Structures are given as C-alpha cells and as structure tokens.
C-alpha cells in the first residue's frame, strides 16, 4: 500500500514538472528598441507606452534611465 502511494506521489510530481516546462517554453521572447519618432525627453512611462502601442503598433514602452523612450516588441 505504501509503495502505491509513493509511486502515485512521484507520478504527480512528474506531471507537474512536465506541465511547468511546457509553460516556460511557450513564452515569447521580447526585445527593446529605442524609438526614433518619440520627441522630447521621456519622463513618464505612460506617454511612452501610449506612443509605442498607438504609433509604432508594438507591445509596450517605457522610459529608461537615459530619459529616452524604449519600445518592447516580440523578437
């Protein structure tokens, strides 16, 4: 009886491990690119994000430490 419960527990961990690996492999890679069309210094990430989504048709955008707008896209 104890061997069955240990085997069942091992099987459950194996299924969970395989399911987690499948999720990790299906994630898309993203890349950041500097935006040439954004004018002025980038202080608010919201305006950069709007620009990247609406004008560049990319995933998102953010202001980085160099006060420039960087857009995120799928690689």
UniProtKB/Swiss-Prot annotation:
| PROSITE patterns cross-referenced by the UniProt entry | GAMMA_THIONIN (PS00940)
Q: Which GO biological process categories is it annotated with? A: defense response to fungus; killing of cells of another organism
Q: Name one GO cellular component term.
A: extracellular region
Q: Where in the cell is it found?
A: Secreted
The record's section on InterPro entries has: Defensin_plant, Scorpion_toxin-like, Scorpion_toxin-like_sf
Q: Which cysteines are joined by disulfide bonds?
A: 31-75, 42-63, 48-69, 52-71
Q: What UniProt keywords apply to this chain's record, in alphabetical order?
A: Antimicrobial, Disulfide bond, Fungicide, Germination, Plant defense, Secreted, Signal
Q: What does UniProt give as the signal peptide span? A: 1-24
* Listed Pfam families: Gamma-thionin
**Mind telling me which PANTHER family this protein's record contains?**
DEFENSIN, DEFENSIN-LIKE PROTEIN 1
- Give the similarity note: Belongs to the DEFL family.
Question: What is the role of this chain?
Answer: This protein is required for germination.
Record-given protein name: Defensin-like protein
**The organism of origin for this protein:** Vigna unguiculata (Cowpea)
């Amino acid at each position: 009886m104890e061997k069955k419960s240990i085997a069942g527990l091992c099987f459950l961990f194996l299924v969970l491990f395989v399911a987690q690996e499948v999720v990790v492999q299906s994630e898309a890679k993203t890349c950041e690119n500097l935006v040439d069309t954004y004018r002025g210094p980038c202080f608010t990430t919201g305006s950069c994000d709007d620009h990247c989504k609406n004008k560049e048709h990319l995933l998102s955008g953010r202001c980085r430490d160099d006060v420039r707008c960087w857009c995120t896209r799928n690689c």
